UniProtKB/Swiss-Prot annotation:
Disulfide bonds: none
Gene Ontology MF: a single term: magnesium ion binding
Cofactor: how bound: Binds 2 Mg(2+) ion per subunit.
Active site: 8, 67, 139
Primary location: cytoplasm
Gene: ruvC
This protein's record includes keyword DNA-binding: yes
Domain of life per record: Bacteria
Protein name per its UniProtKB record: Crossover junction endodeoxyribonuclease RuvC
A Gene Ontology BP annotation from the UniProt entry: DNA repair
Subcellular location: Cytoplasm
Pfam families for the chain: RuvC (PF02075)
Reactions this protein catalyses: Endonucleolytic cleavage at a junction such as a reciprocal single-stranded crossover between two homologous DNA duplexes (Holliday junction)
Length: 173
């Protein structure tokens, strides 16, 4: 059993999603948004760090995954997003968690089966996979998708490592 915390970073709103994986089953544990107050960047980064640190203490995840920075049209937005990611990553690292990073395309491919999926398709699949009673907010759904992507990727890595261990003289055993 593993608890996975997924993060969809943002300098104004950071989404989080927590799932538990037991075998091939994924169970929803929680999701929501950390909403930053104020206009100054430094206090907002502190709020992200504090919020993610609190989530780690609350849910005690075994794994931490975060979405990578995408290329924004506005360079200033990309820099702020990178700093928001940094605050979340340091919070995870500070608690001894390894950090896995996935591109938006990888996340969409893993959850929807299409790397060019629309946000509404991601929300629908997250709701379906986790059997949620309603559709989560966009940022929370994205964070749950990050956690699901890590769950799927980690499961495949475990399967592959199991196959490697079973290979003897070029044959699967």
């Amino acid at each position: 059993m593993a608890i996975i915390l997924g993060i969809d970073p943002g300098s104004r709103i950071t989404g989080y999603g927590v799932i538990q994986r037991a075998g091939r089953q994924q169970q929803y544990l929680g999701s929501g948004c950390i909403r930053m107050q104020g206009d100054a960047l430094a206090p907002r980064l502190q709020q992200i760090f504090d919020g993610v640190s609190q989530l780690i203490l609350q849910y005690k995840p075994d794994m931490f995954a975060i979405e990578q920075v995408f290329m924004a049209k506005n360079p200033d937005s990309a820099l702020k997003l990178g700093q928001a990611r940094g605050a979340a990553i340091v919070a995870a690292s500070n608690q001894g968690l390894d950090v896995a990073e996935y591109s938006a395309r990888q996340i969409k491919q893993s959850v929807v089966g299409n790397g060019n999926a629309q946000k509404s398709q991601v929300q629908h699949m997250v709701t379906f996979i986790l059997k949620l009673p309603g559709t989560p907010q966009a940022d929370a759904a994205d964070a749950l998708a990050v956690a699901l992507c890590h769950s799927h990727t980690n499961e495949n890595l475990i399967k592959m490592s199991g196959q490697v261990k079973k290979t003897v003289r070029g044959r699967l055993r």
